[in-house]
Structures are given as structure tokens and as C-alpha cells.
UniProtKB/Swiss-Prot annotation:
CDD domains: nsLTP1 (cd01960). This is Non-specific lipid-transfer protein. Plant non-specific lipid-transfer proteins transfer phospholipids as well as galactolipids across membranes. May play a role in wax or cutin deposition in the cell walls of expanding epidermal cells and certain secretory tissues. Stable at pH 3. Stable up to 84 degrees Celsius. PANTHER family: NON-SPECIFIC LIPID-TRANSFER PROTEIN 2-RELATED.
Amino acid sequence: MGVSKVAIAVAVMLMVVVINHPAVVEGLTCGQVTGKLGGCLGYLKGGGYPSPACCGGVKGLNSLAKTPADRKQACACLKTLAGSVKGINYGAASALPGKCGIRIPYPISPSTDCSRVN
């Protein structure tokens, strides 16, 4: 009986340790996406040519989105962000990667199916 009490105590202590240590979350967050593209808002609303800061953010985001899961997450975040900002010029948004000298494997559009992004 003493052994089972010790085993239970050890199991409880292990559960407490596991519960109190948050899991490491890997992957891209919407906060990172928003942070990288914050310098692009003027371009996305007014067109013209994106600033060097904007293109730096676009390139940085492209570098962060290393896996298909990251790219799907970035796509979903961009769609959410675009829906929350009034006055976005979607033609300018679609042209943004090319104007910054990068290629992405999916169109930037409110109708993009993020589940198909690889």
C-alpha cells in the first residue's frame, strides 16, 4: 500500500509539472504577420509603390513562412486582417509580392482558399 501511495504522489507531481509548463508553440502567429506587414498599410490603401520598410516586412514574412502549415496560417491571418481594415485595395495587395521582388505560390485575394495553400 505504501508503494502505491508513492506512485500516486509521483504521478500527481509529474502532472503538476506538465500542466504548469506551457507547451512550446511553433509556427507563425497572426501577431507576427501583422507586425511584418504593418509598414504596408499606406501602400495597401493608396497603391503606388511599397516603401522599403514594407518590402522588408514582406520578405521577412516570406522567410518566416517556411512550412505549408506556416503558409496556411499566414494566409488565414492575412484574410482576417484584410477583413478588419477598411479601404484595402486588393489589386495593390495582389501586386505587393511582385513589387517587392518575391514570388508566392498563391494569389493574394479575399477569395483565396487557404486550405489549398502549400
